[in-house]
From Swiss-Prot:
Protein family membership: Belongs to the FtsB family.
The protein's role, per its UniProt record: Essential cell division protein. May link together the upstream cell division proteins, which are predominantly cytoplasmic, with the downstream cell division proteins, which are predominantly periplasmic.
Membrane-spanning residues: 4-21
Alphabetical list of Pfam families matching this protein: DivIC
Species of provenance: Pectobacterium carotovorum subsp. carotovorum (strain PC1)
Periplasmic side: 22-111
Lineage, top ranks: Bacteria, Pseudomonadati, Pseudomonadota, Gammaproteobacteria, Enterobacterales
PANTHER family documented for this protein: CELL DIVISION PROTEIN FTSB
Biased composition regions of type Low complexity, renumbered to the chain: 95-111
Protein's recorded name: Cell division protein FtsB
GO terms, biological process: FtsZ-dependent cytokinesis
UniProt keyword list: Cell cycle, Cell division, Cell inner membrane, Cell membrane, Coiled coil, Membrane, Transmembrane, Transmembrane helix
Annotated spans, Disordered: 90-111
Source organism, top-level taxon: Bacteria
Topology within the bilayer: Single-pass type II membrane protein
Length: 111
């Protein structure tokens, strides 16, 4: 009976080693589980970004308003006879006053 007990203890020890320290053991499982959570978060961010891009594509394909908005914001285009005023934030206005320049407050308004 002693040999059978010894054999079973050795088998149990080998199984415990495989479970805790072996390939595809508990440590690998926990690491992969954490990686899956991180990847799911990245996938959710990318899915939101894709939805925004698809919405923007639909706007650009469907209407002139989106094209006009992009032309105004990115290219600074204005319609004929229209005046464009750029408001300078207060912090930029202070920095402009402290630095010696030829800009006056009336020059900060663009037409």
């Amino acid at each position: 009976m002693g040999k059978l007990t010894l054999l079973l203890l050795i088998l149990l020890g080998w199984l415990q080693y495989s479970l805790w320290l072996g390939k595809n053991g508990i440590h690998d499982y926990v690491r992969v589980k954490d990686d899956v959570v991180v990847q799911q978060g990245n996938n959710a961010k990318l899915k939101d970004r894709n939805e925004q891009l698809f919405a923007e594509i639909d706007d650009l394909n469907g209407g002139q308003e989106a094209i006009e908005e992009r032309a105004r914001n990115e290219l600074g285009m204005i319609k004929p006879g229209e005046s464009f005023y750029r408001l300078v934030p207060e912090s930029n206005h202070r920095n402009a006053n402290t630095a010696p320049s030829t800009n006056t407050p009336s020059n900060n308004i663009q037409r």
